[in-house]
């Protein structure tokens, strides 16, 4: 304490007396310190519990994710020839594959130039337009085609690169093409020629016959003479490598692919070709991976139980309970987890509804035991149903209906699906027959396209086109527009049986539409007739479990307030009427993950309990401050009292000494 004194006049040990008195007075402070230590210990215990719950939640990630069950294991007998990956739509199977050709990209080269940094042409702003398509017919000699035709691939966007005085060197052209990242790679190769050694080499970024190049330069004449390349006409570049498709057989069936990543040959699998040769390919369920995940789940659960036992248990030997013994939060969490594991799930209609059906059982001590043989059998015979036992999953009886998602409100169960209208795409169909003659597009022709909600003004390359060529040009040009691409807006262009131009949005639903507006150059009336506004698409409509559902594009979602609330289904076409059932399961890993995420969140039960303790600690701190202030005053009072006592005793001692002296003097005078 702050006040110090000793019994000078009384010879009393004042400090010792006050210390002993204050020890008695401070007993409430000692009690508060013990209570504070208890609260701090609980905070530490809650931190340990939260960490254990978080570790348990981490063990659920692979089981909670449906893709862990859907992606098959692909094994190639010769990985130097091919390898494969799978998606959720793949099925187990075995395949013999013979690769006879690898896909390759077309490569063309310019005439040699004396230097790489010397300006080419006048520097007038020019545009390099690159189409991608197929070269057919004719013959190829010394890198030049004769009598060939070029058919544009409408699915590949037109590439346009601007060249002006800032980049009209060989290096500048190379860098501009590469920076555009529009499907062509440029490089400069020197052949050692003493006069003109440097060649601009252009390679299609995609392999296959449909990605050959057709290059047209508008603007500077020198650039035109260097780069114009039409396999069906003028060719100022020579072909070094011909675009080629991959060729292979899968179980004896001939397959061609524009890419060495072959899709579609085996449903749900992508085959990556590396060299010519043969290999067996096996697709199988990832049973070993899932079994390892289940074992990891069981171990993590048992680790959590051991932590809970340590935190909430009672030691009969010491007759002491753990820090969280009887704690409502800890016991409540433990009971809720056990409740989830002891409750059957509906599953996906395959008969697996409890953990015990796949060999997992709760023991008397609360731990989870795994029957490896029973688990292995379940994974081998009912793999997809095991997925429904753990993950959030949906399985439709109709192959054209896919489970798309759910919400926390979606109830487990089987729901009937009835479709009253299939979703459609927005489209614009002209009323002018464009097949009877050529379509001539003037220079500086621009059209404003509105695709869905995206709007952009698009320049159409000048030229004379057949109806199919023009449709391909429009599709590639629109889909190559940066503004529309950024918005995810795409179209498909075609010519109807009546010869009309048809533009169809890539999306479905009421927001899907296409409209056109003249800006400059050739009028829309030259190829679309009088039609400039398309017909919007429509949303899917129908019911889930007999109750009206909400349609958005091809997605049908269960309405609020129903058992199917939030259940989303992708309706990939098909007929109207009853479409079978969708089985929805919220598996154990899914339920536990949702529960644990809430439990350890900032608004969960552990955080609430910790907040309450922290509030108690704040209250304790205030009590300590008040008590310390009172003790300070008590000690000061004791010291004041002892000081006064000391003075009195000192005065009495002085009086006693005086009287003693006087009596002694009196006695001496009487002698």
Predicted segments with their positions:
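Bacterial flagellar/type III secretion structural subunits and associated motility module proteins
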Residues: 1-34, 50, 58-199, 203-307, ...
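Contiguous, amphipathic alpha-helical segments that mediate oligomerization or scaffolding
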Residues: 33-67, 304-318, 624, 630, ...
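Mature extracytoplasmic/periplasmic domains
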Residues: 316-329
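C-terminal or internal capping secondary-structure element at the end of a domain, subdomain, or sheet
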Residues: 649-652, 656
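Short, charged, intrinsically disordered terminal tails
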Residues: 660-671
